[in-house]
């Protein structure tokens, strides 16, 4: 995974360096959809909660709304480069139980943001329809916060990581300037598990997104 990150980062740097000199068709994109945060917080904290407390409750809501704003350049019929700002929504984790006859509980939230750069390979199917694949890298920040009835388990932390990413989708040209886009994107290792003593702070995180967007050709 380290070599994949290094390769993706190198490619991103080359893309960004070349962008000002690229002659092509520029466009903007705004998209929204659903994101799933694939993380291990519920399993890790839930195991401790179940082992130490009576009547344990371990709930997680790892799906939310996502959105991105992007700008890109269509270099030719088969290649484009894109840069995007992302909002990954938030995942929420609730744990509760009874300890020594007293209720204990915690509520954790993890919010994600990111900046991404992609190289996009395009395959026209018809004059109006094309499919594409993309690969790139994203700089992702996750803000984590836990409010717990036992103060030693409360925290507020932020972590930033470089995450390789892959995606695929389809695009339909509705008018000369306006297109409709559907795409799936996966962000690898957006978050890395970390602890502060015995307190579990940051989970391992991958993001999966499915979005629908409008692309405007400039």
Predicted features, each with a name:
Residues 24-27, 32-40, 67-148, 172, ...:
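Gram-negative (and chloroplast) outer-membrane scaffold detector with strong preference
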Residues 31-66:
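Long, hydrophobic/aromatic N-terminal blocks
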Residues 171, 175, 180-189, 193, ...:
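K/E-rich alpha-helical interaction surfaces of small helical-bundle regulatory domains
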Residues 1-26:
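Cleavable N-terminal export/targeting peptides
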Residues 46-52, 95-102, 143-151, 188-194:
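Flexible, solvent-exposed coil segments and beta strand-coil junctions
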Residues 68-74, 165-169, 179-181:
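Short, conserved structural micro-motifs that define repeat-unit consensus positions
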């Amino acid at each position: 995974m380290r070599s994949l990150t290094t390769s993706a980062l190198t490619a991103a740097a080359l893309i960004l360096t070349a962008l000002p000199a690229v002659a092509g068709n520029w466009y903007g994109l705004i998209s929204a959809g659903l994101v799933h945060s694939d993380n291990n917080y519920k399993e890790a904290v839930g195991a401790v909660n179940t082992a130490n407390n009576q009547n344990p409750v371990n709930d997680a809501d790892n799906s939310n709304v996502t959105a991105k704003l992007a700008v890109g350049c269509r270099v030719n019929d088969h290649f484009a480069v894109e840069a995007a700002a992302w909002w990954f929504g938030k995942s929420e984790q609730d744990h509760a139980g009874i300890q020594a006859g007293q209720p204990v509980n915690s509520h954790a939230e993890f919010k994600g943001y990111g900046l991404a750069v992609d190289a996009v390979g395009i395959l026209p199917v018809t004059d109006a329809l094309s499919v594409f694949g993309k690969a790139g890298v994203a700089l992702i920040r996750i803000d984590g916060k836990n409010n717990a009835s036992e103060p030693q388990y409360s925290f507020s932390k932020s972590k930033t990581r470089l995450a390789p990413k892959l995606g695929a989708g389809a695009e339909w040209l509705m008018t000369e300037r306006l297109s409709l886009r559907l795409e799936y994107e996966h962000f690898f290792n957006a978050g890395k598990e970390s602890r502060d003593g015995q307190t579990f702070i940051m989970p391992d995180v991958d993001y999966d997104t499915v979005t629908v967007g409008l692309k405007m050709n400039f």
